[in-house]
Amino acid sequence: MLEFQELTVKEGARLRPYYETCDYRLCEYSLGVKLMWRDYLHPWFTEAAGCLIIRNCIEGQYVFDYPILGPEGDAGAALAAIEQYCGDKELPLVLSVVPEDKASQLVLRYPRVTVISERPWKDYLYHTEDLAQFAGRRYSGQRNHINKFRRDYPDAAFVALTDPNDPRLTAFWADYEAEFHKTGPLAKQELALAQEMFSLLDTGWFCAGGMLAEGRLVAVSLAEKCGGTLVNHIEKALYSHAGAYPAIVQAFAACYGGGCDWINREDDARDKGLRTSKLQYLPAALGGKVRLQVGTELDILKRVPSLKTERLTLTALRPSDRDAYNALCLDDDRNRWWGYDYRTGLGDKPLTEDYFLAAAKADFPARRAVNFAVRLKGKLIGEVVLYRPDFRGGFEQGCRIAPEYAGHGYGTEAFAAAADWALYHLGLQRVVAKCFKENEASRRMLSSCMRPNGEDDTYYYFEKLV
């Protein structure tokens, strides 16, 4: 299973090579955004299948970035690892800020998926040459502002900024705060984070520059090269120096745009003023981002169905099943083959008479699993559980029968009926199962109604396909 660790500045040198070659053209696929907005995104990371996998936690919900490929990266295998992680952890699978050109393949990958694409999420993408030159009639306004700025400040010059302790930067932030008129908490937070990002100049991950006029900085900018895109994280200019803003935009693009076809000036944060400003610079494209909320076939079920076989009935669990179900769940000798120790989930909580039944009955409303009570003449003798989705039309299935009813084929009968229902009524593409190699009875049961699908040191694996 994937194991994540927190994404912090300390991990920047390890992660920057992924972002340096990432050509998704979106600002979220940059180290700077992850660091600058870490208190909102809460990003954690891991590496698998030659890819960087980012798990964000936004407003209490886990969402995953599209995998970022390394030199030998396999996006499909990385997605499969994310799917398995969510299935094992009983988490919803949500892929956020997916590049638009990746969305179509993901829609085909997932049988049940909701796709969301909102205008405010889009990044503003500009041809580097356009911003570096401001050529043609369409940019006459920007050129006029720059010409006025240079007439007012004939000594104005662009300078590279590499020292986080540069006293000119300290003076600029003091001047900027004195003129800062926005009162919203997000704007104030962004300003504080911008200053913090400049403290990372000596890492070599970012490029930065400023416009000098009369010996002091009147505009600054900081960006990051990601593939063929220069992602501009920060642009600030003093309001008192008209024309400083387009001047820094042009000079920065000319200085640092080499090797980059695109400049990403990020989204507009739903701010009308920002949107107006970004549109005035005539973006060549809007970088679309798609959110995919992946569901499962359980989403279409309104209730746990009832199934009938020659001897058995499979139904939802009932309150009257409590004692028999407790006995089934507390049978340690048999449940070692179940692969789950209830004590792990129980933790420090007391074991009550209703614990097992309540836990099982909570699975279906959350669409985590379908728990079937296996009944012989109405009496609960075991259960079949359809659980752990792979989000691609497959579920795992397990079965356990009380010891006093073992040896009569009830497990095989119940398991086969549930698998057939899952494939032909629920509409799954596959049902998989596994058993410990020492569990010969389960191996025989699974072999009778499924086909072998490999083994490892611990398990035999089986599957049944439509």
Can you say where each PLM-predicted feature lies in the sequence?
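Conserved active-site alpha-helix within GNAT-family acetyltransferase domains
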Residues: 102-116, 269-286, 412, 437-453
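Aromatic (often tryptophan-rich) hydrophobic motifs at membrane interfaces
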Residues: 206-293, 407
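A short beta-loop-alpha structural element at the N-terminal edge
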Residues: 2-14, 137, 157-171, 313-327
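Conserved donor-binding loop and adjoining core beta-sheet/short helix segment
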Residues: 28-101, 212-241, 386-392
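Conserved acetyl-CoA pyrophosphate-binding loop and the N-cap/start of the following alpha-helix
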Residues: 74-81, 240-251, 405, 409-418
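Acyltransferase donor/substrate-recognition loop-hinge adjacent to the catalytic core
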Residues: 111-183
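Acyl-donor (CoA/ACP) binding surface of acyl/acetyltransferases
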Residues: 14, 226, 263, 295-336, ...
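Conserved GNAT acetyl-CoA-binding A-motif
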Residues: 89-99, 258-266, 425-434
